[in-house]
């Protein structure tokens, strides 16, 4: 599953293995390397010397000549895995017996072969491990028993030798082997059989010639020369000519071009067309299963379904498994099949399909402490007499179909039900389909028991699902072996994606970082708690490395077939791995290995002669008997092994002179004739595999061979890495230069947009707008039952079962209830732009998040669907690739769920984060009355908003409301909502630069109400933790920030102060404030606030550009309503500034509440600088920014659509600096954009030096920047966190006061939740995810990883530093919060260091966190200030643009970020993201108001035109952002300048000059002439 590095060679090596001097006196000899092609090693892959043992695992066997010779032609596969790099090479081996003459004393030693000595492989530079082998025939072997142990003193060898009598002919095992990076097992096997046939035919031709050589010797001569037993000089020139032509054939085969996945196939002619069809080599694209060129269902047939699933359970749960068999082929194929069947998981431990018996110390690998899967021949343990099998290894005997458990094995957990029953049914049905009966079997249980099988003419009547289209029935796709293999893999994927196994897996993963490699934390506790039924299997599976790695792999998967299966696509024509299903779509490359002028054609045309002494090396179509590894004449396996042990096989790695492998001729002498090119448009002849009738590929734009250019090459130039005999020497006989084959693999560019129906019909539409190419959509109801996968291009509404043809506009989304918002949205103008200072805090994000989490059990929001970038569409798959950037992740974490909570639709393994849109039933079908659910959620939020409003007015929660509040706060969604309204923290621009979060003074009545709400929230968090954190617990960061920053003062005069006296106190005037009003608030993740903001340093803020930030779909309407309500807001603001000294400080919150209620219809509330009068003298007012309003629970702001809520569902999607509580977990989502840049962090000094001030720690001192306040301040302030800790004050008055503020339903003591370390870990992981979302670090991980890999070292380091800073900031705040709640300091150290190691934080930031931990003993309570997160400092601008040159184009929203430009669709989903390094040029025309952007798209330049009224502002906004991005790269060496001066010379006059290339054009300067005379041609 790991993406393999491209290899420019189709074949690496072709070797011949056997005994150079076969002996009839021993049953086995040490195998030797007889011949290798090429002679030189490839630099990255030297030929492993151990390959000889893998080719002949039990040694080079010698047997007596037998008449039944054809049965001994066998083939098998083995693998070689590099221990350092993990790269796997495949060996395809054909073993056969060739006869040799028993030496007579008077006979000369053939040709002086003796001096050549023993032979072995070249020096091995690669650490190779493991291989597979297997014979094609399937002999059975009884399990080894005590009585089958080898008896060295007694064997049948002497008896057989006595019976031989006068016969002197014997046979020796010979191996032809191909080593390759590519698993083309069947086609490579055909190549080897063809090579063997060529040598055999040359031997047969000798029989008809009078060469003066005895007939028996003639038959052996060709092989003896070919294997190096005879010297060439001693034989006739005819033999030499034949062998040279055979070697030329081998060299041409080694030069074969390589197929490109999803693009090109290679058709190789190994023999003339009239003798054999061309062999097709093709690789599937990533949307299909990976190529498995062997019968995947083989273990199911050998072991049966039940035993096979038992072995799979052992493998999945990381037990040691050893398979054994006498059949090499069955052994190796079974091991590889088990590994392939666990897809999409990947086996993370050693896999050795065949471990040779005769290899020295091979048994030591079985002592490895890690899990493994190893296949061994049946003779392995009998041969290794002194080896004792470990007592924790499961032994699988394929010959006896038994699974033998180890002595101390733990009981394997049973697979969960009903998933296991469903899986068994599917597997049995797949196997049954290969029987002679072509109709589906009605009762699989009776079939399995061998009873009478009733057949059903149509579909099974007992369908498990109500929708016929979703019934899994692989039989409808054919009963051939390849279709059964696909059905088997589909069944396994569906099993893993079932509710009790891994469904919804990605909901419980938290991405900690992407660079330099992804690090993902898997929350196993919440995952297991979300299972409908708790099973031991799921519990153990969740703890395996395969599942842990799956969380990282799924961020950027190398294969997408599992996602298509989740969308109910099972057709092998769409997901199958065999070339017969897709080869016709690929561009053919024709390559000919066979030379038409070769005399081998004459040999091939000679009919083979057979006599009573027929040679066992002749080929035939099938084996007549089971292959028994040449030991069929032995009465038991023990007899055979005893003979092997007598032979004294040397199993050590050979080290021999490479000259002994010398070829007969040089590769440079190979003559290559050009293949006649096909006529243009001519369809190449189909090969035998593709000529059969297959189901047509249901594609709207499939590329066929006839429509693609047909590249015809005869041979490819070898790469520099190839051997000299293949590339270094000039070939004199080559008639034409060979066209080079590109060595680099291009990613698949299949551009299919398929709409699958039951009849295979194709629905295709044309789209003039390039921004809405067919990508995704929702099928109509009438097509639902037949729909296999949806490729509809638009977000379409379904009316009466037909597709809507009109694109959705912001005003075309119908709201949940009647309101003026809909009409206002329809009448609004889209040509306005909005700017956003995203300096708000956690609460803004939390309030934004809460709007997304309604109806979590129904269909997901359109705002979660993000259009893929154009580059992603071009390089990925033909099925919909909807990357759910950003918003959906928050939905997943905060969605309330619990054990047994029924979800409307099952979630896929990748759930809503999948890069594929959900299948039609998931998107369209909703439980009854969606309006009712939406209204209910809105009512709950409205109720809580009134409660919060009452608390901020000093009226408290209310006795009657307490019970309902506690019940509602059990939802993380509503916790986030309430905390976002409670937080009154304000952070000015000066505070942001100084990394300061100011304390907030509240009245005593407000304190009481807020404390009650916080305690209710803590109780709800206890419930969430009891359910393993389901729904998320990131809200604790927001809660503790409020608790640490909000206080009331006991002094009456302080209660009458204006809030600005506290909020805006300059740092340094109060000796007790260093960097913040309160030392603890500094580390808190800020939460947006409803209250006013402190004024910026300039008093105006960033208002130069009149660009405001788009926050939601109904943004257009909100801009109009802002103008409409501007005066009303101003009047209400003026009313609130009346001097009321005795009024509680934050009665000001009422103004904001009324403002937000007033703007509920529009969803956006604005505070403009134009409405500031003398209000500024009373309270601090922020610059003109969008204030996150609290109308998100309004009924009118809930969109009712088949897709759920859109981006504009709530007004809280708009961003602002101060609307709710600031907590770490939600600050980053303040701006609700779905594709923010990964580096949109303010790069000023305050941000980059976020740890600069607070960590200048000294022994026994408080951290710098967090000094203790004066005793007067501390003694007069009562913070909310003190109430959370219980009555810990000394005075009786304090205790009485606390008792009076407690309610009967709330605990007065410190919660035990604070002592649960797992709670803090889960909260940290949730907070990291939310912060990353807000900063755009997780939006489109595939694209961001690709971009990271394309950047220079400096930019890579910057991105890594951004992630380190984020993690270190949250860890710092975590320490602060744990100190605040009096957690044991030793536990703090252990947990934080564990999280720091899990996060892979860099050295600089980890050292800063360690400094805090080192000073932990001297810190208490609020001594450690909290830090503001990076998402507080993010800024971006959004512009409304039209595609094209006028307003007739579709509306898009262009966001200008720090390092990219994001283009959103009209409903807020991300369509494109253009990194600045990809932009080539940018111009604008003030007259036409058109902006032109040129960008690099692969090797092409693409022009995009946009019309916008703010054309000039957009141009300069992008220009400034690009300049800032370029400033970050000053340390990078500049690239090549466009243009320059080049010395030239006039060829006519010889005069020298300069050629100047500039952006304006080309200029020529000579000493005497400044102009050149141009002649007309």
Curated annotation (Swiss-Prot):
Entry superkingdom: Eukaryota
Chief place where the protein resides: membrane
Domain dDENN stretches: 430-564
Compartments in which it is found: Cell membrane; Cytoplasm; Cell projection, Axon
Residues bearing the modification Phosphoserine: 155, 688, 691, 812, 817, 819, 857, 861, 915, 920, 929, 1058, 1109, 1237, 1266
Residue spans of biased composition, Polar residues class: 141-156, 688-698, 793-803, 1157-1172, 1232-1248
Iron in keyword set: no
Residue spans of biased composition, Basic and acidic residues class: 106-121, 1127-1141
Biased composition (Acidic residues): 614-629
PROSITE patterns: DENN
Domain spans labelled Death: 1336-1411
Residues where Phosphothreonine is found: 1060, 1065, 1235
InterPro entries listed in its UniProt record: cDENN_dom, dDENN_dom, Death_MADD, DENN_C, MADD, Tripartite_DENN, uDENN_dom
Disruption phenotype: Apparently normal in utero development but immediate death after birth, probably due acute respiratory failure. Absent GDP/GTP exchange activity of Rab3A. Apparently normal development of the central nervous system during embryonic stages. At 18.5 dpc, no evoked action potentials of the diaphragm and gastrocnemius muscles in response to electrical stimulation of the phrenic and sciatic nerves, respectively. In contrast, axonal conduction of the spinal cord and the phrenic nerve are not impaired.
Gene Ontology molecular function, alphabetical: guanyl-nucleotide exchange factor activity
cDENN domain mapped to chain residues: 288-428
Region spans: Disordered: 106-166, 604-635, 676-840, 912-940, 1050-1109, 1127-1272
Biological process terms in GO annotation: anterograde synaptic vesicle transport; execution phase of apoptosis; negative regulation of apoptotic signaling pathway; regulation of cell cycle
Comp. bias intervals (Low complexity): 123-140, 699-715, 826-839, 928-938, 1189-1203
uDENN domain location: 13-267
Function field: Guanyl-nucleotide exchange factor that regulates small GTPases of the Rab family. Converts GDP-bound inactive form of RAB27A and RAB27B to the GTP-bound active forms. Converts GDP-bound inactive form of RAB3A, RAB3C and RAB3D to the GTP-bound active forms, GTPases involved in synaptic vesicle exocytosis and vesicle secretion. Plays a role in synaptic vesicle formation and in vesicle trafficking at the neuromuscular junction. Involved in up-regulating a post-docking step of synaptic exocytosis in central synapses.
Subunit record text: Interacts (via death domain) with TNFRSF1A (via death domain). Interacts with PIDD1. Interacts with YWHAZ. Interacts (via death domain) with KIF1B; links the motor KIF1B to Rab3-carrying vesicles in anterograde synaptic vesicle transport. Interacts with KIF1A. Interacts (via uDENN domain) with RAB3A, RAB3B, RAB3C and RAB3D; the GTP-bound form of the Rab proteins is preferred for interaction.
Family: Belongs to the MADD family.
The protein's name: MAP kinase-activating death domain protein
């Amino acid at each position: 599953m790991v993406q393999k590095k491209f290899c420019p060679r189709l074949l690496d090596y072709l070797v011949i293995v056997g005994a150079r001097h076969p002996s009839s006196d021993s049953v086995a000899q040490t195998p030797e390397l007889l011949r290798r092609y090429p002679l030189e090693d490839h630099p990255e892959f030297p030929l492993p010397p151990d390959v000889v043992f893998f080719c002949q695992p039990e040694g080079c066997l010698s047997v007596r000549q037998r008449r039944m010779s054809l049965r001994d032609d066998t083939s098998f596969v083995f693998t070689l895995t590099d221990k350092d790099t993990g790269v796997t090479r495949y060996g395809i081996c054909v073993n056969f017996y060739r006869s040799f003459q028993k030496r007579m004393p008077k006979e000369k030693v053939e040709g002086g072969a003796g001096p050549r000595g023993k032979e072995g492989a070249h020096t091995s530079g690669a650490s190779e491990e493991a291989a597979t082998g297997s014979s094609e025939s399937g002999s059975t072997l009884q399990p080894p028993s005590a009585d089958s142990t080898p008896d060295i003193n007694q064997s049948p060898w002497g008896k057989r030798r006595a019976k031989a009598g006068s016969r002197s002919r014997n046979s020796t095992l010979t191996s032809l082997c191909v080593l390759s990076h590519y698993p083309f097992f069947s086609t490579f096997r055909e190549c080897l059989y063809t090579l063997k046939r060529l040598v055999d035919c040359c031997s047969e031709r000798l029989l008809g010639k009078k060469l003066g050589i005895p007939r028996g010797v003639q038959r052996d001569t060709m092989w003896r020369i070919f294997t190096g037993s005879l010297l060439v000089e001693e034989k006739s020139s005819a033999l030499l000519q034949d062998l040279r032509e055979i070697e030329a054939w081998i060299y041409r085969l080694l030069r074969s071009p390589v197929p490109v996945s999803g693009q090109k196939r290679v058709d190789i002619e190994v023999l003339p067309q009239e003798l054999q069809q061309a062999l097709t080599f093709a690789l599937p694209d990533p949307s299909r299963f990976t190529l498995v060129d062997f019968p995947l269902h083989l273990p199911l047939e050998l072991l049966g379904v039940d035993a096979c699933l038992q072995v799979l359970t052992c493998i999945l749960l990381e037990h040691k498994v050893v398979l054994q068999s006498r059949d090499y082929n069955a052994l190796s194929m079974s091991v590889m099949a088990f590994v392939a069947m666990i897809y999409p998981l990947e086996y993370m431990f050693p896999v050795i399909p065949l471990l040779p018996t005769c290899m020295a110390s091979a048994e030591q690998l079985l002592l490895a402490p890690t899990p493994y899967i190893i296949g061994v021949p049946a003779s392995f343990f009998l041969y290794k007499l002194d080896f004792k099998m470990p007592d924790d290894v499961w032994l699988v005997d394929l010959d006896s179909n038994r699974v033998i458990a180890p002595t101390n094995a733990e009981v394997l957990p049973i697979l969960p039900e009903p998933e296991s029953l469903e899986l068994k049914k599917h597997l049995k049905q797949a196997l049954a389909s290969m029987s002679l009966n072509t109709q589906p079997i009605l009762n699989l249980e009776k079939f399995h028991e061998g009873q009478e099988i009733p057949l059903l003419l149509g579909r099974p009547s007992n369908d498990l699902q109500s929708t016929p289209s979703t019934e899994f029935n692989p039989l409808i796709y054919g009963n051939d072996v390849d279709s059964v293999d696909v059905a088997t893999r589909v069944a396994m994927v569906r099993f893993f994606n079932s509710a009790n196994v891994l469904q919804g897996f990605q909901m419980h993963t938290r991405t900690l970082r992407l660079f330099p490699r992804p690090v993902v934390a898997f929350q196993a506790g919440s995952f297991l708690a979300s299972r409908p039924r708790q099973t031991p299997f799921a519990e153990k599976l969740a703890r395996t490395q395969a599942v842990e790695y799956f969380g990282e792999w799924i961020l950027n998967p190398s294969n997408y077939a599992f996602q298509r299966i989740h969308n109910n696509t099972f057709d092998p024509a769409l997901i199958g791995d065999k070339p017969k299903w897709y080869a016709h779509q690929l561009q053919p490359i024709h390559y000919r290995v066979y030379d038409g002028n070769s005399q081998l054609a004459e040999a091939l045309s000679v009919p083979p002669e057979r006599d009573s002494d027929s040679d066992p090396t002749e080929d035939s179509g099938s084996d007549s008997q089971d292959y028994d590894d040449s030991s069929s004449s032995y009465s038991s396996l023990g007899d055979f092994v005893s003979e092997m042990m007598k032979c004294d096989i040397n199993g050590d790695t050979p080290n021999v002179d490479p000259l002994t492998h010398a070829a007969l001729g040089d590769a440079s002498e190979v003559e290559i004739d050009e293949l006649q090119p096909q006529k243009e448009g001519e369809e190449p002849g189909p090969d035998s595999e593709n000529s059969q009738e297959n189901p047509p590929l249901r594609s709207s734009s499939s590329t066929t061979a006839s429509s693609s250019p047909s590249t015809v090459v005869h041979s490819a130039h070898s790469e520099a890495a190839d051997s000299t005999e293949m590339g270094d020497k000039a070939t004199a006989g080559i008639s034409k230069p060979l066209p080079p084959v590109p060595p680099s693999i291009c990613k698949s560019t299949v551009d299919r947009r398929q709409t699958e129906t039951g009849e295979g019909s194709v629905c295709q539409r044309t789209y003039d707008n390039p921004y809405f190419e067919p990508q995704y959509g929702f099928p109509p109801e009438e097509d639902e039952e037949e729909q296999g996968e949806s490729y509809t291009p638009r977000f379409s509404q379904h009316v009466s079962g037909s597709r809507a043809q009109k694109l959705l506009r912001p005003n075309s989304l119908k709201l949940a209830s009647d309101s003026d918002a809909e009409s206002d949205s329809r009448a609004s103008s889209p040509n306005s732009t909005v700017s956003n200072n995203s300096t708000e805090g956690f609460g803004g994000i939390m309030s934004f998040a809460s709007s997304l989490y309604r109806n979590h059990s129904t269909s997901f929001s359109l705002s979660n669907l993000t259009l893929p970038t154009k580059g992603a569409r071009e390089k990925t798959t033909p099925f919909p690739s909807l990357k759910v950037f950003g918003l959906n992740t928050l939905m997943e974490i905060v969605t309330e769920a619990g054990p047994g909570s029924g979800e409307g639709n099952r979630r896929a393994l990748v759930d809503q984060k999948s890069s594929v849109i959900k299948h039609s039933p998931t998107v369209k079908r909703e439980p009854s009355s969606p309006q009712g659910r939406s209204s209910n959620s809105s009512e709950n939020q409205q109720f809580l908003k009134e409660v919060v409003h009452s608390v901020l007015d000093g009226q408290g929660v209310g006795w009657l409301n307490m019970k309902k509040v506690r019940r509602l706060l059990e939802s993380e969604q509503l916790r986030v909502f309430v905390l976002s309204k409670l937080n009154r923290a304000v952070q000015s621009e000066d505070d942001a630069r100084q990394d300061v979060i100011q304390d907030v003074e509240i009245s005593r009545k407000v304190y009481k109400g807020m404390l009650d709400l916080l305690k209710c929230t803590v109780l709800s968090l206890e419930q969430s933790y009891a359910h393993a954190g389901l729904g998320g617990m990131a809200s604790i960061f927001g809660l503790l920030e409020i608790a640490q920053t909000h206080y009331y003062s006991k002094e009456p005069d302080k209660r009458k102060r204006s809030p600005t006296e506290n909020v805006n106190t300059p740092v340094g005037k109060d000796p007790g404030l260093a960097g913040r009003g309160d030392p603890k608030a500094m580390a808190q993740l800020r939460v947006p606030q409803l209250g006013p903001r402190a004024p910026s340093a300039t008093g105006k803020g960033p208002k130069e550009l009149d660009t405001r930030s788009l926050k939601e779909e109904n943004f257009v309407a909100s801009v109009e309503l802002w103008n409409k309500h501007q005066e009303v807001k101003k009047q209400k603001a003026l009313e609130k500034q009346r001097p009321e000294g005795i009024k509680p400080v934050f009665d000001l919150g009422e103004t904001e509440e009324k403002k937000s209620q007033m703007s509920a219809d529009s969803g956006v509330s604005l505070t403009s600088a134009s409405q500031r009068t003398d209000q500024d003298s009373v309270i601090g007012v922020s610059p003109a920014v969008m204030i996150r309003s609290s109308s998100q629970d309004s009924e009118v702001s809930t969109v009712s659509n088949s897709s759920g809520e859109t981006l504009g569902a709530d007004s809280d999607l708009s961003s602002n600096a101060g609307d709710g509580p600031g907590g770490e977990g939600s600050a980053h989502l303040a701006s609700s954009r779905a594709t923010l840049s990964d580096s949109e962090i303010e790069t000023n000094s305050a941000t980059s030096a976020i740890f600069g001030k607070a960590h200048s720690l000294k022994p026994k001192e408080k951290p710098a920047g967090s000094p203790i306040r004066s005793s007067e301040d501390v003694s007069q302030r009562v913070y909310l966190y003190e109430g959370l800790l219980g009555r810990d004050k000394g005075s009786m008055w304090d205790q009485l006061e606390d008792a009076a503020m407690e309610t009967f339903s709330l605990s007065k003591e410190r919660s035990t939740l604070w002592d649960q370390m797992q709670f803090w870990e889960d909260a940290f992981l949730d907070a990291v995810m939310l912060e990353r979302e807000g900063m755009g670090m997780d939006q489109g991980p595939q694209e961001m990883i690709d971009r990271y890999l394309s950047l220079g070292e400096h930019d890579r380091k910057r991105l890594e530093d951004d992630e380190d800073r984020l993690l270190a900031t949250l860890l710092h705040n975590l320490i602060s919060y744990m100190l605040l709640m009096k957690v044991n300091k030793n536990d703090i150290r252990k947990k934080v260091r564990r999280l720091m190691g899990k996060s892979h934080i860099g050295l600089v930031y980890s050292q800063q966190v360690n400094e805090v931990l080192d000073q932990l003993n001297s810190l208490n309570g609020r001594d450690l200030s909290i830090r503001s997160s990076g998402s507080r400092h993010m800024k971006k601008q959004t512009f409304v643009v039209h595609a094209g040159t006028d307003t007739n184009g579709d509306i898009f929203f262009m966001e200008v970020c720090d390092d990219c430009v994001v283009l959103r669709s009209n409903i807020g989903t991300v369509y494109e993201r253009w990194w600045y390094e990809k932009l080539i040029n940018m111009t604008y025309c003030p007259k036409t108001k058109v902006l032109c952007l040129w960008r690099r798209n692969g090797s092409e330049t693409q022009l995009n035109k946009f019309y916008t009224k703010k054309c000039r502002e957009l141009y300069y906004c992008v220009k400034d952002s690009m300049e800032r991005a370029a400033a970050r790269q000053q340390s990078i060496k500049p690239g090549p300048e466009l243009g320059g001066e080049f010395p030239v010379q006039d060829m006519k006059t010889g005069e020298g000059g300069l050629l100047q290339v500039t952006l304006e054009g080309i200029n020529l300067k000579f000493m005497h002439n400044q102009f050149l005379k141009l002649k007309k041609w």
